[in-house]
Structure formats: structure tokens, C-alpha cells
Design a protein with these regions (language model features):
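Glycine-rich nucleotide/cofactor/substrate-binding loop typically near the N-terminus or early
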Residues: 23-99, 169, 190-199, 205-206
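Anion-binding (especially nucleotide phosphate/pyrophosphate-binding) glycine-rich loop
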Residues: 73-139
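Glycine/threonine-rich beta-strand-loop-alpha-helix active-site module
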Residues: 110-113, 117-120, 124-133, 138-188
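Oxyanion-binding "anion nests"
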Residues: 223-289
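Conserved small/polar residues in nucleotide/adenosyl-binding loops
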Residues: 350-354
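Carboxylate- and glycine-rich phosphate/diphosphate-binding segment that chelates Mg2+/Mn2+
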Residues: 92, 103, 160, 189-252
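Glycine-rich phosphate-binding loop
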Residues: 134, 261-269, 277-316
Length: 354
């Protein structure tokens, strides 16, 4: 009897990671009636991480009312893992670019307020740690909205509360944390982040990610200056320089807020998922490992879930088959990561790598 592990990431806009794993399992069963199969959904810290970790650990999903990037009330979801001590939040859930249509995208006013509401809801459940998946945000406010939703007061020179959005940070003069909800102080925060962009400068949040969120050339200059001003204020208030921290520019600068205010630990998203899901034990059990995601190409080797799965399998000498919606260029280098064959299901294509 052959033992198979099905450990794919989601196929974006088509299948969740668990649905993809179950589809793989059905195919294996059709070919090998005696197969023993385990499904273990994976993710890389981006969109789909909450669902993958909840499914992998037998945790629970929670829905709460939150605000989208433009302040409209929506339903937001976060997960609590089976240990009851770990919650998982994605910035894309409440503050994501997918929440807005193309005409609504405006990082000058978009706010991360809803992500803070998810953090607070999780903290009030009594968890000890919160994993925050950074990515896919519509915001460029350095996490200011997130902080405001937690009770932090950001005031201008007249003592008035700042408006929401990245542009408003140009006017912040005072950071008051005395009104911050005490529940958030009882948790440690782990930032799942696979980009190393700093908060400001030519490789910062505004310059690199601002345009895809709707920022024009002048907006990028405005936002970068506003975030730099906020960073200087954080440094003077807390003694932490967040402007050049690798990953501080993730999710429109939310990484900077998590680091500066909560001392968040930054870790690779796929490493977190591997650890929390128990992938190593599952790989040791298996004879053959299947993984995959929507597209597999040269970028798969840079922090993507299939590469993480293959790395674990390689440590234990297990063969790996990757399945993708489509197969791009540059996959020959994946053999060194432990992927032995790639199947592109869109065109029923098989590619051996190496």
C-alpha cells in the first residue's frame, strides 16, 4: 500500500487549498484503489493562509463586522487554530485590494482600520499569539488605521483626531497609546511576510506597491513623505526606527506598525505554515508527496508553498509531484528544490524538471 500526501496551496479564484488537496486525492484513488491518502492544505502567508491553517489543524473560523478600506461595514473572518492559543488574520481580508473596484482604489484615503478590528476580535478571545499574513492590501497608511481601531489616538497639531488614509499622516503630531485596548497587549504578534521592502524610499511601500493600489506619480511622493514623517514620530516616541526594517513596507506599511508598536517578529509565511500544520511529520509518513498551486514557474522557488513542501520532502528523500493550473517558464531550477515532475492541468501538460 502506497501512502500519498496531498499538500497544495490554493488555486487562486478557483479552489481553496483543501479543495485542491481533495481533488488530488480523488485522482489518486481512481488510479490506486489501495492508496492511503492524507490531505494537508498549505499556504505561503498570503491570501488563503487563514483557511489553510484552520483546515490543516482542525481549527475554527470566526466572522465579525469590520470596516473595508473605505469605511463601509462588511463581514470579516479570521481563524483560531486547534490549540486555541493561536489566531490567524490576513490583511487582505478586511483591507484588501479585492474589496474595491478599480475606480475606488485610492491609497491616499484607504485605511487598514478593518484589519485592526480583526486583531482586536481575536485578542478578545484570549489567544496568546496572532499570526498576521501581510499582503494584498489596498492601503498605504503604515498601519495607522489598524492602530486607530485598537484605540491608539493619532492627533494633529491642534489636538484633533487624524482622518484615515496614508495622506493624513503628514499631519500627525502626537501618538497617544494610553487609550489602546488592553486586550491587544496580552498577545504576541508574528508577521508572515515574504517581502523585504522597507517602509520608505525607492523600494518602499509607496514607490513599489502604491501604483497598483491607484497611486499616481504625485501621490507616491505625497505618501512616501507622509510615511517618512510618521516613521520619525514613531522613532522619537518609542525609540524604534521602522523606516528601514526589512518587511516594514509590507501591506502598505502595516509591517511598520506591527514592528514599531508591538515588536512583531517577522517570519517567512511558508515557514510559519509548515510549522503550524505539522508538515514534517506528514512528509515522514508519506511515500509520495503531491503539491501545487495555480501557477508554477521560476517564481515558485521564492517563498512559495510548493517550494516549501518540496524542501521538506527532500530532507526525507521523498519524491514530489507538483500540479499547477498552468506551467510557466524557468521551472528547470525547481529540481534542485526537490520537485521531480510538474503537471500543468490546463493543457494536460507534463514536465519533468532537472
Amino acid at each position: 500500500m502506497t501512502r500519498y500526501l496531498c499538500a497544495p496551496d490554493s488555486f487562486k479564484e478557483s479552489l481553496t487549498a483543501m479543495q485542491a488537496a481533495e481533488a488530488m486525492a480523488r485522482g489518486i484513488e481512481n488510479a490506486d484503489r489501495d492508496a492511503e491518502i492524507r490531505c494537508l492544505p498549505m499556504a505561503d502567508g498570503g491570501e488563503g493562509t487563514v483557511r489553510a491553517l484552520v483546515d490543516a489543524t482542525g481549527g475554527t473560523m470566526h466572522a465579525v463586522p469590520v470596516h473595508d478600506p473605505l469605511g463601509r461595514l462588511i463581514e470579516g473572518r479570521f481563524g483560531v487554530l486547534a490549540d486555541g492559543a493561536t489566531a490567524v488574520v490576513e490583511t487582505a481580508e478586511a483591507s484588501g485590494l479585492a474589496r474595491l473596484n478599480a475606480e475606488e482604489r485610492n491609497p491616499l484615503i484607504a485605511s487598514s482600520y478593518g484589519t485592526g478590528e480583526l486583531l482586536l476580535a481575536a485578542a478578545r478571545l484570549g489567544v496568546r499569539r496572532i499570526i498576521v499574513g501581510l499582503g494584498g492590501s489596498a492601503t498605504n497608511d503604515a498601519g495607522a488605521g489598524l492602530l486607530q481601531s485598537l484605540g491608539v489616538r493619532l492627533l494633529d497639531a491642534n489636538g484633533d483626531e487624524l482622518g484615515r488614509g496614508g495622506a493624513a499622516l503628514a499631519d500627525v503630531s502626537v501618538i497617544d497609546i494610553t487609550t489602546m485596548d488592553p486586550a491587544i497587549g496580552n498577545v504576541s504578534i508574528i508577521a508572515a511576510c515574504d517581502v523585504t521592502n522597507p517602509l520608505t524610499g525607492p523600494t518602499g511601500a509607496s514607490a513599489v506597491f502604491g501604483p497598483q493600489k491607484g497611486a499616481g506619480a504625485d501621490d507616491v511622493v505625497t505618501l512616501d513623505a507622509a510615511l517618512a514623517h510618521f516613521a520619525r514620530l514613531i522613532e522619537s516616541r518609542f525609540g524604534v526606527d521602522v523606516s528601514d526594517v526589512p518587511g516594514a513596507g509590507a501591506a502598505g506599511g502595516i509591517g511598520a506598525a506591527l514592528k514599531g508598536f508591538f515588536g512583531a517578529e517577522f517570519r517567512s509565511g511558508v515557514d510559519i505554515v509548515i510549522e503550524q500544520s505539522g508538515l514534517d511529520e506528514a512528509v515522514r509518513w508519506a511515500d509520495v508527496v503531491f503539491t501545487g498551486e495555480g501557477a508554477i514557474d521560476a517564481q515558485t522557488g521564492f517563498g512559495k508553498a510548493p517550494a516549501g513542501v518540496a524542501g521538506a520532502a527532500k530532507r526525507y528523500g521523498k519524491p514530489v509531484v507538483a500540479v499547477a493550473g498552468c506551467v510557466g517558464v524557468g521551472i528547470d531550477g525547481l529540481h534542485g528544490l526537490g520537485i521531480d515532475a510538474v503537471f500543468g492541468i490546463a493543457r494536460s501538460e507534463e514536465r519533468r524538471v532537472g
